Amino acid sequence: MARRLFGTDGVRGVANVHPMTAEMALQLGRALAYIVRSGPHRHRIVIGKDTRLSGYMLEQAIASGICSMGVDVMLCGPLPTPGIAFVTHSMRADAGVVISASHNPYQDNGIKFFSRDGFKLPDELELQIERLVLDAGEDDAGAEEFRALRPTATRIGKAKRIDDAIGRYAQFLKTIFPKELTLDGLTVVVDCAHGAAYHVAPAVFEELGAKVIPLNVKPDGKNINDACGAVHPESMARAVKRHGANLGLALDGDADRVILADEHGNVVDGDAIMALVGRDLLARKALAKRTVVATVMSNLGLERALAPLGGKVVRTAVGDRYVVEEMRRSGYSFGGEQSGHLVFLDHVTTGDGVAAGLNVLAVMVREGKPLSELARCFEPFPQALVNVEVREKRPVAELPGVAKAIAAAEKALGAEGRVLVRPSGTENKVRVLVEGPDAKRARALADGIAAELRQAIG
């Protein structure tokens, strides 16, 4: 069924413009509260947010919707997305709500939901919420009850703040770092993107012994992700060189992903992190089924890095939720995305930038090697990416010229490369990715496929 509100990471848009309005947030809160109600006990939902100006408006609206259904609210305030997932699970709440647009600019905002076990809400429940909100639940069992449910008196939900949410999450993060190791003597640059991790991230690394150089830790509601953080790691990389640091981390606005820089200021992306951590886990026989889960966007260099140690890569659709779904379904323990979403399922339930940084630092300390040396195991294949604007999105099978160009490119590359043609989830564009050992050849093949796309549907 086509989604009308939810994308791959919740509901998102420009704040105060449909669907990211206070009215919609209230209705989403009512629908979420309705589907988690079961049994006579008092139900509770955790709400957290990043540092956007519009977060206050949406927080109050969604809390009002939840309370109007007789469900209590626990407000965390600014806290990373993985922190809200952790608090939801650890406090045995019935669901969690994150108000954030992740790496987007401050004008945008979003709402995403977590189940009581700390994982993102399954597709079927998101679709049920959509139907309740957009169709007033006309086709759902219990729709009449949803429309009529208006608790009164003491049955109305209450909202209260969790004053120690940051402390709870910080304490949990420190348990991820091995007790026999220490960060004493290491200098770490931490770019918090003026986002949700501005309190917790610097504190965690400092309490584990590192000298911390904090960057972008003064949110004003408008500066989140502004020329900083995981999407713009350049200033973090420069700070690493300037301070002679051992490692730099750039988190995004909700701190569910991270991009690193080595001691020379060279940027280390999610693929390289998966390669070096995957090799460490393989060497210690700690990687479930000797497999790393990545998406179709990850570089072929990842397979090449893991193969000498007997490691494999399983690929999913783009989106960290699909990585996690595959990990849970098949019993894998580690995976992520090139963009820096990294999931250590033995510890966390979703992408966690701080947890990823701690795991990389553990490898550095355990091996006694700098990040530049560890990351050398990953040699990315040249990639050519072309974004083609199209008037409509149609299956490749319906476009003979495009299908022929793809087949020819795949034949030319053989086992030494790959071709990926996929529509954008948010724009009228089709993305053409060609990967191979020769950059010029990859570009020529990508341009050829793009030309066929423009001729067919451009």
Curated annotation (Swiss-Prot):
GO biological process, one term: carbohydrate metabolic process
Active site feature: S102 (phosphoserine intermediate)
EC identifiers of the protein: 5.4.2.10
Cofactor(s) listed: Mg(2+)
Residues binding Mg(2+): S102, D252, D254, D256
Entry annotated with the keyword Nucleotide-binding: no
Record PTM Phosphoserine, positions in chain: S102
Keywords assigned by UniProt, alphabetized: Isomerase, Magnesium, Metal-binding, Phosphoprotein
GO molecular function, one term: phosphoglucosamine mutase activity
GO CC entries: cytosol
Catalytic activity, as annotated: alpha-D-glucosamine 1-phosphate = D-glucosamine 6-phosphate
Cofactor note: Binds 1 Mg(2+) ion per subunit.
Transmembrane segments annotated in the record for this chain: none
Modification(s) after translation: Activated by phosphorylation.
InterPro entries noted in UniProt: A-D-PHexomutase_a/b/a-I (IPR005844), A-D-PHexomutase_a/b/a-I/II/III (IPR016055), A-D-PHexomutase_a/b/a-II (IPR005845), A-D-PHexomutase_a/b/a-III (IPR005846), A-D-PHexomutase_C (IPR005843), A-D-PHexomutase_C_sf (IPR036900), A-D-PHexomutase_CS (IPR016066), Alpha-D-phosphohexomutase_SF (IPR005841)
HAMAP family referenced in this protein's UniProt entry, alphabetically: GlmM_B
Functional note: Catalyzes the conversion of glucosamine-6-phosphate to glucosamine-1-phosphate.
NCBIfam families according to UniProt: glmM, PRK10887.1
Family: Belongs to the phosphohexose mutase family.
Name of the protein in its database record: Phosphoglucosamine mutase
Organism name: Anaeromyxobacter dehalogenans (strain 2CP-C)
Organismal lineage: Bacteria, Pseudomonadati, Myxococcota, Myxococcia, Myxococcales
Gene (name only): glmM
